[in-house]
Amino acid sequence: RGYELGIMHERLRVLPFGNGKWIMRHRIDAYAANSFSASGNGHLISTMLDYSYGQLYTYRFPCGLVWRTGGEIELSGGVLYNPRNSNNPAAAKTSIVLGFAEMLTYTLHIGRFPIPFRYQLSLPVLGAFFSPAFGESYYEIFYLKNHSGIVKFGSWHNRFDMNNLLTV
């Protein structure tokens, strides 16, 4: 149980090459969450900031459907805070991933009013993640220089993540 508040900003722009068929997309997501365990004795607070940049190629179909497909790079960072954890009450989360980006757009006209429908899919494929060992303190990582194994490789075999967005 809990709640999450977030805001997203996205900017699309046609690139100067490719006869208007290539677009670039900048997306920034910021959110904060506060969650509690079902028994009420666990509590987790998190904040995250994500930025992604992608380039997408545009296909236009005679029926009015527009399909954009391409790749993107995403940078993420944030903090998890667990008040019950005495060793590391706050944990940093960072990642960088490369993936696919898809977008389907269709505009429905009701009278004079256009109603655009858009579905977006982001599917990370390869990435690197900051992931300390369980129970490893930041004192051990940064002061004692125990850096081995804190950056992990990620792909579909150990971190499947798919972001979907539907807008009307």
Model regions and ranges:
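Short loop/turn motifs that connect adjacent beta-strands in outer-membrane beta-barrel proteins
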Residues: 14-24, 58-67, 109-117
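Short glycine/proline- and aromatic-enriched beta-strand/turn motifs that initiate or cap beta-hairpins
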Residues: 1-27, 33-35
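Membrane-embedded beta-strand positions of outer-membrane beta-barrel proteins
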Residues: 24-28, 69-73, 117-121
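Residues on the lipid-exposed face of transmembrane beta-strands in outer-membrane beta-barrel proteins
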Residues: 7-17, 49-57, 100-108, 119, ...
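Outer-membrane beta-barrel transmembrane domain signature
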Residues: 87-167
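Residues that define the transmembrane beta-barrel architecture of outer-membrane proteins
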Residues: 3-7, 22, 43-51, 65, ...
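Extracellular loop and loop/strand-boundary signature of outer-membrane beta-barrel proteins
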Residues: 1, 34-43, 85-91, 151-156
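Transmembrane beta-strands of outer-membrane beta-barrel pores
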Residues: 30-36, 73-81, 121-129
